[in-house]
């Protein structure tokens, strides 16, 4: 690794930016063409609470340009007993208590950075609020019945205030280290100290990247995962039959029930991520170490999601409805035949159109009238194991609307609830035993420049106290079959369950697996 030890942001530029903004990123670019995102994560974050790794594989194959590592978060905003709570330092004037969504929006406004034109060359994510919204956050947006048991007691949201970030540029072979200087007390008394502190944190990150790691080369096998299903095939079939009856009665067009699968495991979450990265690369790959109030890891989130809820970039909101699926073929010729079959399937296309309309309606709530449009309607995208029908819906955020407004307008995804959305969620509450928690929520970020990118939390494991929780479901329509839907949910969960089972077998080459 080679580093230019001078910070890219000069003290003079920092003073100018700090006069108008309470968060100023101080950066340093290092040559790191022999590092991988995983090795950089191990060096910079080392599985500490409040750290993360975010990556993307385009169409399940080639890796996107950027990977992001969260190396430090001095505080996090979460929810306790319905109230906004900070786990750590509280930025001056940031709300404590009250509506957590309002507290989040006020915090984003207080800590807004200069726009990208004022700071050219910054990576797409340089700092912000990174974390998750659980599915049950919807109870703050819609009035739903309260029947499902809250057995995991997860917070409705937790977002890290990510101050120390490393952006891995796969095209250049460089890593941009970012230490965000945060003005915690809202005064200009300690500007030079804040700059010096940011440079010192850059020094710590630079030194960490220069340290060697033990070899992580490993072999693995793919055993059958030992897991427990929340429902039997008969029980799940009865749920599907009930929902089909409700659809026939005109209560909904589609409902998306799900069930949870559990697996006992003490495997390191980073090893599960490593396996997912190989076996199920997806547009949204993530590893988060979620802290508790004691500063320890409460639980880990490991995921490989194919689908965004919404992205916001420079005032434009975009969502990509996905509905319609075929498994990938064994050859390119088989893929072409399966694509033609999917494009000719009237049922799949009708479901896709319904979700596109839902996406248009969601964005229409927060976008300037006349700007919402559908692009690339119903085209095929191939992923590592499946292909989907995908469309793009985009719109310009209205005056006074924010990235958080776009997230809440689209939340939860129609692909995880159904249509009409509120009635579908009411029916879900009738048939699911336990609250969904993370499943059907989102994982991603709201940055300090007003942008956002959130993945739908599917193909995701929540790992806590020796148990991994994986949840999956599928859309039920008028002619759905119970046993088919049960197998569909199980197959969707298997990508992650298989990764956990494989991670348990990781061993150095030549190691004796039997222990003899």
From Swiss-Prot:
The UniProt entry's GO biological process terms, in alphabetical order, are: L-tryptophan biosynthetic process
Does Membrane count among this protein's keywords? Answer: no
User: How does the record describe its quaternary structure?
Assistant: Heterotetramer consisting of two non-identical subunits: a beta subunit (TrpG) and a large alpha subunit (TrpE).
Q: What is this protein's function per UniProt?
A: Part of a heterotetrameric complex that catalyzes the two-step biosynthesis of anthranilate, an intermediate in the biosynthesis of L-tryptophan. In the first step, the glutamine-binding beta subunit (TrpG) of anthranilate synthase (AS) provides the glutamine amidotransferase activity which generates ammonia as a substrate that, along with chorismate, is used in the second step, catalyzed by the large alpha subunit of AS (TrpE) to produce anthranilate. In the absence of TrpG, TrpE can synthesize anthranilate directly from chorismate and high concentrations of ammonia.
Q: Which cofactor does it need?
A: Mg(2+)
What protein family does this chain belong to?
Belongs to the anthranilate synthase component I family.
Is Metal-binding one of the keywords UniProt gives this record?
yes
Species for this entry:
Mycobacterium tuberculosis (strain CDC 1551 / Oshkosh)
Stated EC number for the protein is 4.1.3.27
Reactions catalysed = chorismate + L-glutamine = anthranilate + pyruvate + L-glutamate + H(+)
Name of the coding gene: trpE
Q: How is the cofactor bound?
A: Binds 1 Mg(2+) ion per subunit.
Q: What GO molecular-function term can you cite, just one?
A: anthranilate synthase activity
InterPro entries registered for this protein in UniProt? ADC_synthase, Anth_synth_I-like, Anth_synth_I_N, Anth_synth_I_PabB, Chorismate_C
The upper taxonomy is: Bacteria, Bacillati, Actinomycetota, Actinomycetes, Mycobacteriales
Which positions in this protein are listed as binding L-tryptophan?
56, 283-285
Please tell me where chorismate binds in this chain: 324-325, 439, 459, 473-475
- What residues does Mg(2+) bind to? 351, 488
Q: In which pathway does it act?
A: Amino-acid biosynthesis; L-tryptophan biosynthesis; L-tryptophan from chorismate: step 1/5
Q: Under which main EC class is this enzyme filed?
A: lyase
- What's this protein's name? Anthranilate synthase component 1
Regulation of activity: what does the record state?
A: Feedback inhibited by tryptophan.
**Superkingdom to which the source organism belongs:** Bacteria
This protein's UniProt keywords = Amino-acid biosynthesis, Aromatic amino acid biosynthesis, Lyase, Magnesium, Metal-binding, Tryptophan biosynthesis
């Amino acid at each position: 690794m080679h580093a230019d030890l001078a910070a890219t942001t000069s003290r003079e530029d920092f003073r100018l930016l700090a006069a108008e903004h309470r968060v100023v990123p101080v950066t340093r670019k290092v040559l790191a063409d022999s590092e991988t995102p995983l090795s950089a994560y191990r060096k910079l974050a080392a599985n500490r609470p409040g750290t993360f790794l975010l990556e993307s594989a385009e169409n399940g194959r080639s890796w996107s340009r950027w990977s992001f590592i969260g190396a430090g978060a001095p505080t996090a905003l979460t929810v306790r007993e319905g109230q906004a709570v900070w786990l750590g330092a509280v930025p001056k004037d940031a709300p404590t208590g009250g509506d957590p969504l309002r507290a989040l929006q006020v915090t984003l406004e207080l800590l807004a950075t200069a726009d990208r034109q004022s700071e050219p060359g910054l990576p797409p994510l340089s700092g912000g609020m990174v974390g998750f919204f659980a599915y049950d956050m919807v109870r703050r947006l819609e009035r739903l019945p309260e029947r499902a048991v809250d057995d995991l007691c997860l917070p409705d949201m937790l977002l890290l205030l990510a101050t120390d970030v490393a952006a891995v540029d796969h095209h250049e072979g460089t890593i941009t280290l970012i230490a965000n200087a945060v003005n915690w007390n809202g005064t200009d008394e300690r500007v030079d100290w804040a700059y010096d502190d940011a440079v010192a944190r850059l020094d710590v990150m630079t030194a960490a990247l220069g340290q060697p790691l033990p070899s992580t080369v490993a072999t693995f096998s793919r055993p059958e995962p030992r897991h427990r299903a929340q429902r039997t095939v008969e029980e799940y079939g009865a749920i599907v039959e009930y929902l089909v009856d409700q659809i026939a009665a005109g209560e909904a067009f589609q409902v998306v029930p799900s069930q949870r699968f559990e697996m006992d495991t003490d495997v390191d979450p980073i090893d599960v991520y490593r396996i997912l990265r190989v076996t199920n690369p997806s547009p949204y790959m993530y590893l988060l170490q979620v802290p508790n109030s004691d500063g320890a890891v409460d639980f880990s989130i490991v995921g490989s999601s194919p689908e965004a809820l919404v992205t916001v970039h420079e005032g434009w909101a975009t969502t990509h409805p996905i509905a319609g699926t075929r498994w990938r073929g064994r050859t390119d010729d088989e893929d072409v035949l399966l694509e033609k079959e999917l494009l000719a399937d009237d049922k799949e296309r009708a479901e896709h159109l319904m979700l596109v309309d839902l996406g248009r309606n969601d964005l229409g709530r927060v976008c300037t009238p006349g700007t919402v449009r559908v692009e690339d309607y119903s085209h095929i995208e191939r992923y590592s194991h499946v292909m989907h029908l995908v469309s793009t819906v985009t719109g310009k955020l209205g005056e006074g609307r924010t990235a958080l407004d776009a997230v809440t307008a689209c939340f939860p995804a129609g692909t995880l609830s159904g249509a009409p959305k509120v009635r579908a969620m009411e029916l879900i509450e009738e048939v699911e035993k336990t609250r969904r928690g993370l499943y059907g929520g989102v994982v991603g970020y709201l940055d300090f420049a007003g942008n956002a990118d959130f993945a739908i939390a599917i193909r995701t494991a929540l790992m806590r106290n020796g148990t991994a929780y994986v949840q999956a479901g599928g859309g039920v329509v008028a002619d759905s079959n119970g046993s088919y839907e049960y197998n569909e949910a199980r197959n969707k969960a298997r990508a992650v369950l298989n990764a956990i089972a494989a991670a348990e077998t990781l061993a150095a080459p030549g190691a004796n697996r039997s222990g003899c």
